[in-house]
């Protein structure tokens, strides 16, 4: 299903659709946008509209999906030690934000910041919350860059010297779900990259 993660109806509908297939055991939140914008750019100050849009999708959308999924997970019987696992997606930009990433870094920093309190709140319901902070990954956002730019970015990752792949992300999700003691943590999935200021 497709939808606007900033709309609560979308979150409710997504959870209801998932429940038609059976209990909701895992939520992977990975919708996001990376709208560039400096605090003060060529066209003047960063607009509240741009900031609000990025925060609405990357942060509010994440929280909305978490809330709807957690409500469904709380109502179901545990499977092993868990009723469910919520995996959120932040970014290394939450830690190493570059010039021009004010809105994006703020939105992903908020996802990092809410991980522990959400895990603590949901612990009594046997629901775990873990966040992945990907580095330079092969994503639709990255696909919009020229090939030369993607190649240059791939050399910035120390090891392996490439862009992260969707399979790398999926493997970490699988590991998070299968490890019942992993909770309230943010895991960098970045090949040891640290973003430069520009």
Where are these regions (language model features)?
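Short, small/polar-rich loop/turn modules that mediate ligand/substrate recognition or access, typified
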Residues: 123, 128, 182-185
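Conserved mid-core segment of classical short-chain dehydrogenase/reductases
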Residues: 12, 34-52, 71, 75-80, ...
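Catalytic Tyr-x(3-8)-Lys segment
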Residues: 54-56, 148-168
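Residue(s) in the substrate-gating loop at a strand-loop-helix junction
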Residues: 91
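C-terminal substrate-recognition "lid" of short-chain dehydrogenase/reductases
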Residues: 165-189, 194
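The beta1-alpha1 cofactor-binding region of Rossmann-like NAD(H)/NADP(H)-dependent oxidoreductases
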Residues: 2-13, 48
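Active-site helix of classical SDR
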Residues: 66, 107, 115
């Amino acid at each position: 299903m497709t939808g606007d993660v900033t709309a609560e109806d979308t979150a409710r509908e997504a959870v209801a659709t998932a429940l038609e297939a059976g209990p909701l055991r895992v939520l992977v939140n990975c919708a996001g946008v990376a709208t560039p914008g400096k605090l003060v750019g060529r066209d003047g100050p960063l607009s509240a509209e741009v900031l609000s849009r990025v925060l609405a999708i990357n942060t509010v959308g994440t929280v909305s999906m978490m809330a709807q999924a957690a409500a469904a997970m709380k109502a179901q019987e545990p499977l092993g030690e868990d009723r469910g696992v919520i995996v959120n997606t932040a970014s290394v930009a939450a830690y190493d934000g570059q010039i021009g990433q004010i809105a994006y870094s703020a939105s992903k920093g908020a996802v990092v910041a809410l991980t522990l309190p959400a895990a603590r709140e949901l612990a009594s319901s046997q629901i775990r919350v873990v966040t992945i902070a990907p580095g330079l990954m092969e994503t639709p956002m990255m696909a919009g860059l020229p090939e030369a730019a993607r190649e240059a970015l791939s050399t910035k990752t120390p090891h392996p010297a490439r862009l992260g792949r969707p399979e790398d992300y999926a493997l970490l999700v699988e590991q998070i779900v299968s490890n019942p003691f992993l909770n309230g943590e943010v895991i960098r999935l970045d090949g040891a990259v640290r973003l430069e200021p520009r």
